[in-house]
Amino acid sequence: MLLFLVFILVVSQVVLLLLSPQFRDKFIFRWYYDEVYKPMILDNSRYRIKFYVVPVFYLSVYSYMVYIFYSRTFAIISPMLTSIETYVVIPLMLILPLFFGSMSMIIKPDSSNAHQIGSEKRYPYDNLLYFPQHECRTCKQVKPARSKHCTVCNSCIYLADHHCVWINNCVGMGNYMYFYSFLCSNLLLLSYSFIRLIFIQFNKSAYNTTPTGEKSLLILSILCGSFTVILAVYCYFVFELVNSGMTTNEKDKWQMVHDYINTGDLVRDPEGKYFIKYQNGGNNYEFYSTDSYDGTQYTIVDYFTVKSPAEITNIYDKGNFINNLREFIG
């Protein structure tokens, strides 16, 4: 009964939190929006303990699954495990996600607040996604190529990918290796556990168990299988970006460029500079730089319409997955 009441309380708070922006003109929602939603969600400077909710959730689920394994299933399946699995493989695979997860949280990426000498000049400006001599509107420092300001970390992150809520840290120059290792170690543990548990359950004659033990095996198998699929899909998208030589932040920028190409609005002048073409009645066009900081209207007479992404070179792509991976973790 107590758990049910707690569940109802949590669900009601989540519903109020999600609906308060849309119905903030209503009394109860207005109060919730002003006193809870704004300080908890919109204001990153207040209640910063909120950023640890997701890491604690991950650790709770992880601990629960380990508890089920050792308290309810290990004794059942141990006769079918080899000594290497029992004393080396399983303990090691249980430790690695915690180790790499901790390192991903602790190791901060290079940023405008703290970075190695020269790291801010590591990448050239491509004059399509990134432009020189731009000052970050928030931290008031020159923005290096491939950087992005993070409102949670309150700094410009070099080689910025994204702010990961699972580790409460930005993924960027200096901690890609730990983040990728965190993903892979979790995927390895989950997939191994799922496959091993399924194999064991198909050989029920080799062990004796109670209905409770059978239920625990089933719960653990479902959890491992579900998380394996989710994490495998996510890892695929992460490493597909690596293969393309781009970050998550750059993927969104490239998507915008591709949208302009599809509509025939991205053009290039004889000097190789890119502009966005806007129709201004009839055959009249206005031209603006792809630089969001530059609001100047340009007059261009001679230009070439970019018709395919293949006509644009991603100067940050090193040609293959291995070289790009070295670039990220190097």
Curated annotation (Swiss-Prot):
One GO term (biological process): vacuole fusion, non-autophagic
EC number: 2.3.1.225
Catalysed reactions, as listed in the record: L-cysteinyl-[protein] + hexadecanoyl-CoA = S-hexadecanoyl-L-cysteinyl-[protein] + CoA
Residue ranges annotated for the DHHC domain, each copy included: 134-184
Subcellular location: Endoplasmic reticulum membrane
Keywords assigned: Acyltransferase, Endoplasmic reticulum, Lipoprotein, Membrane, Palmitate, Transferase, Transmembrane, Transmembrane helix
Enzyme class: transferase
Transmembrane region(s): 1-21, 51-71, 87-107, 182-202, 219-239
Main location: endoplasmic reticulum
GO cellular component, one term: endoplasmic reticulum membrane
Pfam families according to UniProt: DHHC
Membrane topology: Multi-pass membrane protein
GO molecular function: protein-cysteine S-palmitoyltransferase activity
Cytoplasmic side: 22-50, 108-181, 240-330
Coiled-coil regions, chain positions: none
Family: Belongs to the DHHC palmitoyltransferase family. SWF1 subfamily.
Function: Palmitoyltransferase that targets several endosomal SNAREs. Palmitoylates the SNAREs at cysteine residues close to the cytoplasmic end of their transmembrane domain. May have a role in the cellular quality control of transmembrane domain-containing proteins.
Domain comment as written in the entry: The DHHC domain is required for palmitoyltransferase activity.
Protein name as catalogued: Palmitoyltransferase SWF1
Taxonomic source organism: Candida glabrata (strain ATCC 2001 / BCRC 20586 / JCM 3761 / NBRC 0622 / NRRL Y-65 / CBS 138)
